[in-house]
Amino acid sequence: MLHSFRRSLLLLALCTPAVLAQKKVKEVKPGAVELKRLENQWAAGLVRRDRALFDRLLAKRFIYTENDKMMQRDDVLHEVAEGTDTVTAARNEDMDVHEFGATTAVVTGWLIVDGRSKGQPFTHRYRFTDTWVKRKAGWQIVAAQDYLAPR
């Protein structure tokens, strides 16, 4: 009996570190899946110059900052539809969704944009922080901040 008890203690001592070292499986929340989908729509909308998409996604009082400039919703809509740069490809990488209750979330990640400006090709890598609010009609972005990462 004592031998059996010692064997159980030894087994417990050997197994406990392995159990504790296991990585916790990250829970995927439905809001996170939806927000990543919307962020990817944003990237695709840049290529298509999809004003209707941005009109739907951007809240009425949306604000955007990029490096040293700030724009309101109407400025962003104009830039998307009629801006001088041509975006040929855009994709998101390493997105994380930080939910604050059921109706507010912040999405962080990288946006990589390829295109042409004044006849010259470019590839820009932006670090972004987007703040989303869930309304009756669905998620809308209320604020976005991007900065152009140094090469």
Annotate the PLM regions.
Residues 103-113:
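A short hydrophobic beta-strand element
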